[in-house]
């Protein structure tokens, strides 16, 4: 593993993609398992023996009560040690700041050892921090593997530089890893920003770009764009394993949103298969969405129960501080969920 890590520092993204293309699915699992990439925000992700999840409490109208209800349920089932992260409907600075303050208040009241994030544009989050004093544990941005692709996201490196500087000066985390990036094969092709290169190479370039900012979280949203770029479950599975391997070889702490769209030839069993393979490969985290059905983004991914089930199957635990918090709350005991798990009313009794 040390030799791989040393060699990876000299690899360009194009070489990382080239290596990936030579490998079978089992090769991708076997090699990725050898590579541990950890990062620290408020807690440390990626340590041996751990497996984490992002709690994704999305809501169709950003209703505070609906969002917090999802947060309560997810936490009670052991989700959220990677981050509590919302994709907002309303991308206004005021709304983003309001949700961040709500997350922070809840986190502090219940002493939850995790990170909070609202996945708005980097400039919106920066303004929310500077103008409204919004508490920011992580700065999020979707990124692409070319300048033109990032411009399609309304993004350039200077914006990320400013966002990271804001986090290091005003962020509410201990750091030093303060950034969260999402990627996914096909985004550059959908915006005519691939410059003639294939989607695996373009995805690898995303990870090279991400590495510049020493992120805490990076994940591919592997089947989100749909069958135009990943046709069926076989291709989604392959892409998920490719992305995880390439991220690790690049040297970033890699997770995966194992997901699919409704018009793709895939179902929930396929996504659970991919999630299982990713845990075998040493993936840092997956998503947790109520019932695995995101009512706002309109796609399917892993639910609140999957992370706990996979931890039990593979003998893994959440991030240590979060694991201890789950035991203190009575949601888990010796790494297994208790009968109290899933009872969100625990949070309504105090």
Mark where each language-model region is.
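Anaerobic metallocofactor- and corrinoid-dependent redox/one-carbon enzyme cores
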Residues: 1-70, 76, 81-350
């Amino acid at each position: 593993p040390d030799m791989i890590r040393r060699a990876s520092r000299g690899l360009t993204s194009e070489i990382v993609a080239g290596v990936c293309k030579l490998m079978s699915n089992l090769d991708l699992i076997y090699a990725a398992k050898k590579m541990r990439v950890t990062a620290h925000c408020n807690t440390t992700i990626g340590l041996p023996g751990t497996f984490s999840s992002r709690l994704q409490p999305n809501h169709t109208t950003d209703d505070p009560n609906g969002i917090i209800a999802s947060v309560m349920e997810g936490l009670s089932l052991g989700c959220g040690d990677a981050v509590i992260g919302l994709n907002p409907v309303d991308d206004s600075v005021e709304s983003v700041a309001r949700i961040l303050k709500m997350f922070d208040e809840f986190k502090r009241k219940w002493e939850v050892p995790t990170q909070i994030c609202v996945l708005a544009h980097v400039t919106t989050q920066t303004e929310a921090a500077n103008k409204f004093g919004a508490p920011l544990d992580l700065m999020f941005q979707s990124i692409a593997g070319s300048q033109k692709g990032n411009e399609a996201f309304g993004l350039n490196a200077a914006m990320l530089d400013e966002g990271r500087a804001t986090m290091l000066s005003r962020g509410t985390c201990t750091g030093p890893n303060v950034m969260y990036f999402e990627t996914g094969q096909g985004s550059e092709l959908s915006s005519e920003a691939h410059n003639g290169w294939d989607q695996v190479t373009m995805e690898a370039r995303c990870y090279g770009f991400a590495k510049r900012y020493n992120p805490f979280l990076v994940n591919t949203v592997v089947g989100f764009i749909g069958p135009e770029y990943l046709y069926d479950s076989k291709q989604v599975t392959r892409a998920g394993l490719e992305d995880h391997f390439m991220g690790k070889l690049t040297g970033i702490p890699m997770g995966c949103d194992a997901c699919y769209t409704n018009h793709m030839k895939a179902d929930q069993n396929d996504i659970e298969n991919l999630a299982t393979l990713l845990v075998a490969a040493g993936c840092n985290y997956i998503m947790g969405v109520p019932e695995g059905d995101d009512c706002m983004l309109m796609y399917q991914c892993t639910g609140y129960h999957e992370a706990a089930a996979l931890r039990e199957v593979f003998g893994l635990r959440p991030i240590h501080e979060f694991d201890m918090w789950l035991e203190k709350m009575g949601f888990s005991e010796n790494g297994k969920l208790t009968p109290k798990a899933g009872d969100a009313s625990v949070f309504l009794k105090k």
